Amino acid sequence: MSIKLKANLNNPPISGLATAHLINGTVPVEIVWSKEETSLQFPDNRLLVCHSNNDVLRALARAAPDYKLYGETAIERTQIDHWLSFSLTCEDDISWALSFLDKSIAPVTYLVANKLTIADFALFNEMHSRYEFLAAKGIPQHVQRWYDLITAQPLIQKVLQSLPEDAKVKRSPQSSKEQTPAKTGERKQEGKFVDLPGAEMGKVVVRFPPEASGYLHIGHAKAALLNQYYALAFQGTLIMRFDDTNPAKETVEFENVILGDLEQLQIKPDVFTHTSNYFDLMLDYCVRLIKESKAYVDDTPPEQMKLEREQRVESANRSNSVEKNLSLWEEMVKGSEKGQKYCVRAKIDMSSPNGCMRDPTIYRCKNEPHPRTGTKYKVYPTYDFACPIVDAIENVTHTLRTTEYHDRDDQFYWFIDALKLRKPYIWSYSRLNMTNTVLSKRKLTWFVDSGLVDGWDDPRFPTVRGIIRRGMTVEGLKEFIIAQGSSKSVVFMNWDKIWAFNKKVIDPIAPRYTALEKEKRVIVNVAGAKVERIQVSVHPKDESLGKKTVLLGPRIYIDYVDAEALKEGENATFINWGNILIRKVNKDASGNITSVDAALNLENKDFKKTLKLTWLAVEDDPSAYPPTFCVYFDNIISKAVLGKDEDFKQFIGHKTRDEVPMLGDPELKKCKKGDIIQLQRRGFFKVDVAYAPPSGYTNVPSPIVLFSIPDGHTKDVPTSGLKVNAPDAKATKKASSPVSSSGQASELDSQISQQGDLVRDLKSKKAAKDQIDVAVKKLLALKADYKSATGKDWKPGQTSASSAPVPAASSSSANDAVSVNASIVKQGDLVRDLKGKKASKPEIDAAVKTLLELKAQYKTLTGQDWKPGTVPTTAAPSASAAPSVGVNDSVAQILSQITAQGDKVRELKSAKADKATVDAAVKTLLSLKADYKAATGSDWKPGTTAPAPAAAPVKVKQEKNPDPASVLTVNTLLNKIAQQGDKIRQLKSAKSEKSLVEAEVKLLLALKTDYKSLTGQEWKPGTVAPAPTTVNVIDLTGGDSGSDVGSVLSKIQAQGDKIRKLKSEKAAKNVIDPEVKTLLALKGEYKTLSGKDWTPDAKSEPAVVKKEASPVSMASPAKDELTQEINAQGEKVRAAKGNKAAKEVIDAEVAKLLALKAKYKEVTGTDFPVAGRGGGGGGGSAKKAPKEAQPKPAKPVKKEPAADASGAVKKQTRLGLEATKEDNLPDWYSQVITKGEMIEYYDVSGCYILRQWSFAIWKAIKTWFDAEITRMGVKECYFPIFVSKAVLEKEKTHIADFAPEVAWVTKSGDSDLAEPIAVRPTSETVMYPAYAKWVQSYRDLPIRLNQWNNVVRWEFKQPTPFLRTREFLWQEGHTAFADKEEAAKEVLDILDLYALVYTHLLAIPVVKGRKTEKEKFAGGDYTTTVEAFISASGRAIQGATSHHLGQNFSKMFEIVYEDPETQQKKYVYQNSWGITTRTIGVMIMVHADNQGLVLPPHVACIQAIVVPCGITVNTKDDERAQLLDACKALEKRLVGGGVRCEGDYRDNYSPGWKFNHWELKGVPLRLEVGPKDLKAQQLVAVRRDTVEKITIPLADVEKKIPALLETIHESMLNKAQEDMTSHTKKVTNWTDFCGFLEQKNILLAPFCGEISCEDKIKADSARGEEAEPGAPAMGAKSLCIPFDQPAPIAASDKCINPSCTNKPKFYTLFGRSY
C-alpha cells in the first residue's frame, strides 16, 4: 500500500514533491495531479487536506522517520518548526527577511543540523515561487549560495523537470504577479475544530440567539461564525433567534442593527425566529411544573433570595400547596399589584453545590409592553427557562455555548427532563477575550453615555461595526475567529493577532499613495528634472488594480526625518521615480535643515543599499493637495488584562485618539468613503471621510480623514507619522530639562493632591456614582498632564522638581544613578511580589519589561551592568542634608490620620455597621497607608512612630574605603535573608496557607541568589559578613537614647508578665488578643529605637560611638577568652547529652552556654559562629582541628544531564520522580502523590482533591469492609454534618481533645448566627440524642449503625495529604448493646476486620493492641488499635481504632432500656469504630519506591495494563491491526476472568513512555505483547514490585495472571513484614531505648502505664536543640499495648523510664508517630 499525493496544478508543492521522491524507496508515494486542493491519502484511507506546502512536508517526514528529515532530537525538531513557521510568514513577501536569512545561513551549509531537512525544503519553496521578484531586489550572497545548493539537489531538478506543462505555466516568472491574488484567495487558515458528538451530515441544527439590546461585538461575532461553520460543515441548518424574553431591554431598532451586523459578517441564517413565538407554550409548561410540584410561587425579596441561595436555605414558600401556587400564579398572569411581588421558581435542590441548581427563577411578572406582543402578557420567562424549551421545540441538535455557561448545563438538562422534551447536546467553547478592552455591554454603554467615544461604531470599540470602521475586513475577521476554532482554552488574545490576519487580506489589494507630514517637510531641488506627469501602478505587485498619475518636477517635498537621513554624495531612491544623487543638505544657523540640493541619476539602477523615500512634487496650485488628516488610535483601556475586582475606569485617562495634519497626494481625491489604502512607508488606512470639493455655502473643501489600520507589528513603520502617546523630539528635549517644567509640575502636584482628597471625600460620603466618576476622570486627566510635564508617573508623597535644588553638573549623573538604582530595587521587589502572588503573565511581563528598561538606563549612566547590592558613588552630601522638619511633620500628620481612621474602622465594626460604610472607611485607611509608604518608603506597621526632627546636624568624619559597597551590601543581604527566614518559620509554625508560605520562600530564594551574585558563594546557615575595612567615626550630638530603650524594655517585660498571667488564669481569647497586639507594638517600637529585634536577653545600652573595626582590630583578649569558654561549655553540653544525664542537668548546662554566647555577641557585635567552631579569633589565629567526620550512609549519585556530541545539555524528561525516598522523603512523597495522579492541591490549606486513582483505592476498601460489616448485621445511615454547641459540649471529657480542632460556623452571609454551629469532628454527639429516642426497650437493641462521611478537624500541625488533613473521609460505626460482653466482642471483631484491611487489601503488616490511658479515645473505657510502621521515616502511624465507650455516653445522653427481668432502667453499652483515608497515605509510604507508586493488587484500580510493543515504521498495517486486536482480545479475556485490566493503545506515546507512566502510577502488572510474542503465542508479564519479567503462554492467562497477582500481594506483604520486624526492638534500659529510637526503630519496652510517666518518657526522648537539622525532633510516645506480648513481665523488670519506681505491667510499643 502506498501514500497517494494529489498535487494542485495551480500551486504545485515543489519541495513536497521532492520529499516524496526522496522517501519513495521505503515509503511508496503515488503522485497524482489535479486542480483540487493538495492532499495526502494514507493506506488506512485517512485523508489529510494540505493547506500549505508545509503540511505535505510534515506528513511525509513523519511517515518516513528513518530519513530524519524532521530532525533527530527535540532541539532539532524545534528549530525545524521555527523555520517552517518562518516560511509561512513569508508567503506574501520574503524580501523583508533576506538580511535576517543571510545572517542565519552565513556560517552553515543547511538551516538545521548541518544536513538536508524539511526546513530547507520549506524555505526553498517560498523563494522559488517568487525568485524573479527577489532577484530584482537583490539576493544577499549567502542566501544565493544556499538557494543554488538546494536547487542543484538531484531531487529538486527531477521535480522541476517532471512538472506538467500546466504547472510550469503557473510557476513561470511572468505569471508570478498574477499568482499573488490567486494565492491569497486560496489561503485557508482554519483553527482546530472538533467534530460535534453525534453529528450527522444534513441533520445538524444550530442556533445563534442574541438579545436585541445592543450592537454585536467581536465575542458575538465568534459565536455567530462558529455556529455558521458547523451548519455549513455538516450541511445543516442555522437558526437566527432573537431572545426577547426581557421586554425592558429588547427593541426593534437593535434587531435591525444585529441583522445588519450579520449581513456585514456575510452570515445568512436559514431560519429567523423569536423566543416570544413560544410564550403560550411556555405558560403551559410553567403551569405543568407547578401542578407536578416541580415549581412554586415565591415572594422572597431579591436580596434575601440571593442570600438564601448562597447559604442554601430553603424559601418559606417552598412547601406551599399546589392550589396556593396556582392561585398566586393567576395573580401574576393578571399582572396585579400582588402578582408583581411574586416570581416562579423551579423546585430543584437548594443543597446542591452548584448554585444554578438552587431553585432558579423561571418566570417573573413585568407589567411592561413587549416590542412584539405588546401588552398581551404580564409574565415573561427567564432565558434559562426559555432556552432549553425553544432549543428542543426548534429541533436544535447541538447547543453551542461559551464555557462560562458550563455550570448551567445541569439546569438546562433538568428542565428538559422535567418537561420530557427532546435533549439537544451542549457543546462548550471558550469565550473570546481581547486585551486592553471590555466586552461587557454595560461597560461599553458607559463609554458611549460618558461621551468618551463617538458611538457604538467608534473605531476604538470592539463592536463589529467599530472594528470594521477602523479598517477590519469581514474576511480578515472571519479568518481570525475561525482560526481560534472550538477550543475550550480561555486565553486573552492580543489585538495585534487579529490585525495581522487582516493585513494578509488587505495587503494584496490596497492601492499605494503618498502623504507627508504637513508641518515637517523639506524641499529638494532636483537639477535636471522637468515637470511631467507619468502613470504608475497603484500596487507594485498587481497591475490589475489600476494606475495613478505621479507629477515629476525640479522641486519636490520630502519628510523632515527623511532629510535628516540623507548623506551628501550618496544616492537615494525616490519611489516611483528612481535614484537621485544628493549633492548638498542646506542648514540654517541653528542646524535645522532648510533644503536639499540634488541631481537626477536615473541611469544608476542599483537600489540595494540606497535610502528609499516617499515624496510629492511641488504643485503650482496649493489647492491641488487635498486637506488630509491621519487619525491614530490607542486601546480604550490602558491595562492589558483587568483583575477580577479592578475598576476599568482607573485605566481610561490616557490619550486614545490623535489627529495629524498631512500633505496629501492629489490622487487621494479619487478615494471613496470606505476604501482601504496604504500610505507608503506609513501603513494602512481606511477612508472614513472622503474628499469633497469646496461647498457652495462655505467655499471650503471637505478634508480626507484617514483612520490608521494596525497591521499586527509591534515595531513602528519607519516615518509612519505621530503615534499616540509618543512625544516628538522637541517635547522630549523640553521634558529633559527639570528647571523648565518645575513650576508647572509643582502646580499640577498640588492640583492632583486636592483632587485626590475630593475623590476620597466623595467616596466616604457615598456620593452619587456619576459624580464620583466625573471627579475620578478629572484626577486621571491631571495625572496624565503631570506625566507629560515630568516624563514620569505621579506618585503620592513625591516632591516636584521645584522643591529640589538643581544638582551640580559634576554630581548629576551620580544622583541620577542613585535614583535609578533605587527604582531598580523597588521594581525588583514588585516583580518578586507579583510572582509570589501568582499574578497573570501579562502583568508580570510588563513589570519585568520596566525592570529591564531601568537596568539599561543604569548602564547608560554608569557604564556598567547593574548587580544586586550595587551602590552608585555619589557626591559628598552637604551639612544641610539632614531630613527636613517639614517632611517629618508630614509623616507625623499621616500617622495621626492612620491612627484616627483605624479607630473609626474598629468602631464601625464593633457597632455592626453596614458593609458599604465599613468598606468606605477601610478604603480611606488603605489610601492613608499608601500615602505613608510613599512618604517614608516602608509599609506602615502598628506602633510605628514618626522620626524625630533633627536637632543638630550629624558630623561624619569620612575616610577612604577601598570597597564600601561590597561590605555594606553583604551585611544588608545577610540581614534580609535572616529576617526572611524568621518570617517563613513563623508562617510555618502558625500553619499559614501553603500559597502564602510559597510566596515568601520564593522571595528568600531570590535574596540568596542575589547573595551568590554578589559574593560568588552559596549562602549557608551561620554565614557572617566580613568586617568593614574602614573606620567611620560618627559623633551624635543628640540626647542619650538609652533611657528610651530602657523604658520600652521595661514596658515589654511588664506586658509579657501580664499576658502570661492572663493565660495562666485561662482568660478568654478576646481578652488576651488585644494584650498580645500591645506587646507586638512595643517590640516594634523597640526595634525602631535600637535597630534590632527584641530578644529575651535584650538590655538597655547607652548611646556610644560605634566603630566598625577591621578583622585585625577585633582580635581582643576578651573575645579569645569567650571563644574558649563557649567551646568548653559546648563540650560539656554534648557530654551530658551523650551520657544521658537528667534533663535538669542538661538544661542548666545549655543555659550557661546561651549566656556565654549572649556575652560574646555583646562584646563583638556578632553572633558566635556555629560552623567550624573556630578558636581564638584574630586574622592569623589557627582554627581548632575539626572533629573526625563520622561516616554517613552513601547517598545515591545525582546524575548530571547527559551532553550530546555538540556539548549541549540534552533535555531531561520530567515524567519521573526528581526526589528520592531516602534523601528527601517530604518532596518524594509530594511528587509521588501528584505525579501518580492521586491528589490535586486545593486553595484551602489542609484540604485536598482526591483524584480517581486514589478514590478507587478508598472505594475498594469501602466495598470490602461494607460487605463484611453488613454480614455482621450493621446497617447504613447518614447524620448531619453540623453539630449545635450545646450538644457538642455535653460530654466535656469527650470534647476536650477535639476542642482546639473544631471548626465553627459563625456567620450566615454578613449576619452573625444566633449560636455558633460546629462542623463535626466526630459524630457521637450528633447520633446519640437520636439513639436515646429510638431505644425504649431491650427489643430495640442492639442498634448497629455505620455511616461513610467526611469530618473536619482543623489541626494546626503541618498538613500532609492523606496522613494529616483538615478534612478527611472515613467510616464511623456506632453501636449500642444491652450486654457488655457482646459489646466487648464486637470491639475485637471489628479490629480483626481493620487488620485484614491492611494485610488482605493493602499488604501492610500491623500490630494489634490496646491504647494506654493517655492515648485512648476521650470519653471511652478503652481503645483498641492497629498500628502500622513506615521505615522511611522511622515513625509509626495509627491505622484504625475500635473503641469501647462503656456507659459513659449513654449516661450523658440518657440512652436507656427497660430490663425484661427487673423492669428497671439500664444504660446501654456502646462502641464506636472508624478507619480513614489515612490508610492510602500509609500504603504509599510503605510500598512506593523511587520510580513511583506500587499498588497492592487487591486495591489497584487497574491490576494489569496491556501495552502493545514492537510496532515500527516497517510494521505492516495488517500486522499492526492484528497485534492491536490480539491485545484487545487478551484484555477482554482477563476482564472476563475477574482481573481489572485495561489496554494502552495510544499511538502518540512510545512503549517506553507508557512503561514509565504505568510504573509511576503503580499498576501491579504490565503485560507486553509484540509481534514476536504473538507468533509464539505468549506474553511478557512485568511485575511492578520487583521489575521481574515472566513469560506466560496466552492459553493460560486466565489462570496464571490471577495467581501471579496473589503472588505479588504475598511478596509485598512479606517484604513489609520483614521491614517492620527488623525495625522492632525489644529494650529494657533507657540507653538502648534512646539509641534504637534514633536509628528509626519502634520499641517494645516494659511500662507501668501511668500518664505522668508516659509524659516523662516523651519529653526525655526528644532531640535536643543541637541535634541533626531536619531530623524528627519529637520524643517517643506509646503506640499501643500489643495483644501479643513479646515476653511476660519478670520480677526483676523495671519501667523503661529510669526515674520511675512503679512496677511495669506490660510491654508497650513506643515510637515516634504521625
Curated annotation (Swiss-Prot):
Motif 'KMSKS' region location, chain numbering: 438-442
GO molecular function, one term: RNA binding
GO BP annotation list: glutamyl-tRNA aminoacylation; prolyl-tRNA aminoacylation
Residues with Phosphoserine modification: 1110
Family note: In the N-terminal section; belongs to the class-I aminoacyl-tRNA synthetase family. Glutamate--tRNA ligase type 2 subfamily. In the C-terminal section; belongs to the class-II aminoacyl-tRNA synthetase family.
EC code: 6.1.1.17, 6.1.1.15
Keywords attached to this entry: Aminoacyl-tRNA synthetase, ATP-binding, Ligase, Magnesium, Metal-binding, Multifunctional enzyme, Nucleotide-binding, Phosphoprotein, Protein biosynthesis, Repeat, RNA-binding, Zinc
Span list, region 6 X 57 AA approximate repeats: 755-1201
Annotated source species: Drosophila melanogaster (Fruit fly)
Comp. bias regions, Basic and acidic residues: 1094-1109
Motif ('HIGH' region): 209-220
HAMAP family, sorted: Glu_tRNA_synth_type2, Pro_tRNA_synth_type3
Protein name as catalogued: Bifunctional glutamate/proline--tRNA ligase
Sequence positions that bind ATP: 1353, 1355, 1364-1365, 1438, 1441, 1476, 1478
Location of the region described as Glutamate--tRNA ligase in the Swiss-Prot/TrEMBL record: 170-754
Alphabetized SMART domains for the sequence: ProRS-C_1, WHEP-TRS
Chain residue ranges for the region called Disordered: 166-191, 718-754, 791-817, 943-962, 1093-1119, 1168-1210
GO CC list: aminoacyl-tRNA synthetase multienzyme complex; cytoplasm
Domain called WHEP-TRS: residue spans: 744-800, 816-872, 890-946, 969-1025, 1044-1100, 1118-1174
Catalytic activities: tRNA(Glu) + L-glutamate + ATP = L-glutamyl-tRNA(Glu) + AMP + diphosphate; tRNA(Pro) + L-proline + ATP = L-prolyl-tRNA(Pro) + AMP + diphosphate
Bias kind Polar residues: ranges: 172-182
PANTHER family documented for this protein: BIFUNCTIONAL GLUTAMATE_PROLINE--TRNA LIGASE (PTHR43382:SF2), PROLYL-TRNA SYNTHETASE (PTHR43382)
Compositional bias (Low complexity): 734-746, 800-817
The encoding gene: GluProRS
Summary of subunit composition and partner proteins: Component of the multisynthetase complex which is comprised of a bifunctional glutamyl-prolyl-tRNA synthetase, the monospecific isoleucyl, leucyl, glutaminyl, methionyl, lysyl, arginyl, and aspartyl-tRNA synthetases as well as three auxiliary proteins, p18, p48 and p43.
Residues noted as binding Mg(2+) in the record, renumbered to the chain: 1438
